[in-house]
Structure formats: structure tokens, C-alpha cells
Amino acid sequence: MKKTDWWKNAVVYQIYPRSFKDSNGDGIGDIPGIIEKLDYLKELGVNVLWISPMLESPQDDNGYDISDYRRIYKEYGTMEDYEKLLEEAHKRGIKILMDLVVNHTSDEHNWFIESRKSKDNPYRDYYIWREPVNGKEPNNWGSAFGGPAWEYDPQTEMYYLHLFSRKQPDLNWENEKVRQEVYDMMNFWCEKGIDGFRMDVISMISKDQSYPDGEMNGGLYGDFGPYCVHGPRIHEFLQEMNREVLSRYDVMTVGETSGVTIEEAQKYAGEDRNELNMVFQFEHVEDQGSDHGKWTTEKYDFQEFKKVMIKWQEELAGKAWNSLFLGNHDQPRSVSRFGNDNPAYRETSAKMLATCLHMMQGTPYVYQGEELGMTNAYFCKLEDYKDIESIQYYTELTDAGLMEPDYMMKCLMLRSRDNARTPMQWDDSEKAGFTDGEPWIKIN
């Protein structure tokens, strides 16, 4: 397959399908709703859509917990709807990126259902199982969503690893059969006609096989980062993926690589590396100085933001390609975060940030609603939040006495992922033109 660099001239628009456009009045966005808005997206100047996961899922983490890699989630539509989306988008010169979630599956995936049945089940080694240590977890790692990163399973009296929710068990990439299953699935979707992959937490698929304790860093659990992020076989796995799948198609790839350095980004995305086209780095959106990660009310330092952006522009130039983003489904709204969402300054802030984004070298990623200057929702009651991360951390940190409830609620208002997940505001009506029914989450 002749490969081209078409992605260097692309403008990518991220759709969070649950919140984009509901076509049937059930309060949940869907594929026909996306098709309905393709002309709007073309007029906007978009030529690539990255659509967050639309595959079968119990929705513990809004689709990032996949239970079947070859079926469309029923509330979003059917495979026929998805094929029509591909056809209609391609007619308009718009390409489609699939969100590839292969660090973990849902615990309702058939592989995991089989894996937990017995220690000698053929699927046992599809996941990461360890014996208890002194009757407790195999090590002190904490999950990215709060609580321990290990879940005890009484069926076989062992623990399985989940770096995210307990309903998101990590796949064992050391197992060649797992890797082949993933590559077969990727080839299936490429044959359907998709144009590439955004790879969810892809830098976490290779783990240090000694599973040592992590540093506590003032929290309740140890940090898994040094042992699971940019792990010992990560580049070997991605080069194998390139040989088995990516080199066969003229597709675009971008990897989510939390904590990546300039040097590491060159390994992932250097043109001679045969791995990825680009990565998402998060240095410009990382919180500094909090014992509890992002849960703080400290204001962002805009001068520091500019320094980070300049550094990545200058030091990656000619070595690897930059991805450019200010927000996504995991971040607060960029206008509220980096600008000023006071009505007097919201529009000016949004235009300033858009100018910043589109005038740098790299591929820009616009998150749905960013083009309208959408702001944080500032929900002030816990029951208004749907995000598993927000709810679990609120409970964990307040129950442990590490944060006062009022302060933690202020943190949620500023930092919760739900700020980005309120329905797209198509008009100024009560339900924002998103749905005729009751929206799954409150309208901003």
C-alpha cells in the first residue's frame, strides 16, 4: 500500500457520540444524528472525524469498556448505520478515525467471562492475573479512577489488574494470541473502510512484568506510572502492529501517550520508526503541585502553557509530527480553563485560543462545541455528575478525610470530565437542539 502524509493537512474534529446529536428522542446521541450533521461539519472545514467509541459496551466508562469489538452499541445504531456514516462522510471528503481501546476490555467481554472461569481456561492469559500477597492485593498500585488497581475474584481466588475501572480489566499484551486478536480486529475495520485509529492509552499496553510497588506520593495508593507507561516492550508491540495492520492501509494514527517526553515522542512518531504518525502529549494540560493529581482549584499558569507549546513546536520540528489540541472528552472546556468564560470575554477567549491552535505546525484537533466557545457546566450537586472518575474520586477523597466535601465539589466544577460531556448546543432552546427527549446528562 502506498502511504501518503494526508494527515499533515487534516483538521480533525472529535465527536463524543453520546452527546453530539440525538435523532430518535431517547436522550442519547447516535449515528443517524452524526450523519444529519455532516454538512455542518464539512462547512466548518473539517476533513477528519475522530469518533469516541461506538462499539458494544455496558457503558461503565461511556464506551471505553468494550464488550464486543465487532458490533455497534445498540443505542448508537446498527452496523448498517455505521456503514452509511462511512459512505456519506467519504462522499463529502471527510475521513473517519475509530477510537481503538485495546489496553483493556469490559469485564463483560466474552474473553474475560471465559478468563475468570478457571485457572486453566484457554482465555486465562488474555488478562493479567496474580496471586494474593499476604492475603491482599499483589502490589500497592492505585487505579486511575480511584481505589486499588486490583480486583479480587473469588471464583479462582486471584486478583486481576485494572488500571482504570474494576469493570475494565487490562489485556495481557505479553500473550501473542491477544495481540493477534487485536490485529485481526483492526484489519476487520480497515477493510470496512475506516481511515485510521486514535489509540486510547496506548502507551500503557506494556507492563513491567515484576509488578513492583509504586511510590505513594502523598496518596492512598502507589503510582503505577513508572511500571506501566512507556513500558519495556511498547515500541516492539507498536512496530509489530504496524507490520500486521497499519502498513497495509493508507491510514492515520495518533496515540494517547500520557506523560510522554519530547525524546519519547520521537520514538513513537519518528518517520523512520514505523510506529505511529503522531502522539497526544499532555504537558500543557497537566496539573502541577497537587497531591491528588488534577483535583485542585489552582488556576492554570497561562505563561507556562505558552512555554510548553513553544517547546513542543521547536523541539519536535523536523523530528516528528505534532498533534495540537486544547480540549477533549477527558478535559474541562478550554475557554473555561485557559481563557475567561465570563460572558464579556467568552467569545474573545474562544477566538484567541482557536488562533493559537490553528496557527501552529501540526494537526489540529477540535473538540465538539469548541467552535462555539462552549464552557464548563459547573454542576454543583454530586447527583448531576455521570462520570465514573469524578464520582469515585469524590467518594474516596472525602471518605478518607483528605478533602472537605465543599472543596472537592469546587474541584469537580473546574476539573470533571463531565464539563466536556454535556450535550452539543445546536441552538438556544431548552434542550439545545440536541434531543426531543430527556438528555442523558444535564444541558449546560
Please name every model-derived segment:
Residues 1-444:
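Active-site and adjacent substrate-binding regions of carbohydrate-active enzymes
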